[in-house]
């Protein structure tokens, strides 16, 4: 599904994306030897779990049979599902975990951009705004969580 045709398909891709990120952070938190990295990764699991629930809640409100179709756009890149320069494959340090969490993910941005530009329908624009706001809030929460006052 590299070229989603409906709003529901975008939500399915977002559900898969957040589920994969949650699983990655959970695995890394379990393997972490750096205590601060483990705490951060556990917090990231909570944030991704929240994102996953928000997306699933939006999906429950839509009937996939009565889909809102997207305007045509470029095919989404499947190869970019995580930051290319991320160091979270093994046992990341706190700084590597933080960089991973804050690194902009190209696929997520593509999905949200496609949703934002797909329709003039207020309900779709509202959905796109809610999902974009959620990602911005997550970024602020990560930044606040890691502040050293």
Give residue ranges: language-model regions.
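Short, charged, intrinsically disordered terminal tails
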Residues: 147-149
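Alpha-helical transition-metal enzyme core signature, strongest for iron centers
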Residues: 11-25, 44-59, 101-108, 131-142
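Short loop-to-helix capping motifs
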Residues: 33-35, 121-122
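Acidic interhelical loop/turn segments
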Residues: 113-132
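Alpha-helical bundle segments that constitute or directly flank the non-heme di-iron/ferroxidase center
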Residues: 1-32, 94-118
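Carboxylate-rich helix-loop segments that flank metal/cofactor sites and access channels
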Residues: 60-94
């Amino acid at each position: 599904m590299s070229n989603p045709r409906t709003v529901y398909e975008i939500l399915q891709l977002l559900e898969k994306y957040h589920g994969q990120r949650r699983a990655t952070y959970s695995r890394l938190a379990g393997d972490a030897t750096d205590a601060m990295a483990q705490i951060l990764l556990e917090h990231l699991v909570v944030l991704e779990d929240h994102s996953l629930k928000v997306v699933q809640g939006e999906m429950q409100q839509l009937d996939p049979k009565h889909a809102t179709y997207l305007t045509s756009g470029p095919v989404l890149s499947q190869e970019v599902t995580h930051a290319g320069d991320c160091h979270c494959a093994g046992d990341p340090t706190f700084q590597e975990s933080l960089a991973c969490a804050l690194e902009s993910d190209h696929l997520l941005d593509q999905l949200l951009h496609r949703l934002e530009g797909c329709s003039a329908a207020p309900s779709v624009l509202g959905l796109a705004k809610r999902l974009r706001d959620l990602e911005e809030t997550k970024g602020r929460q990560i930044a606040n969580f890691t502040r050293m006052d």
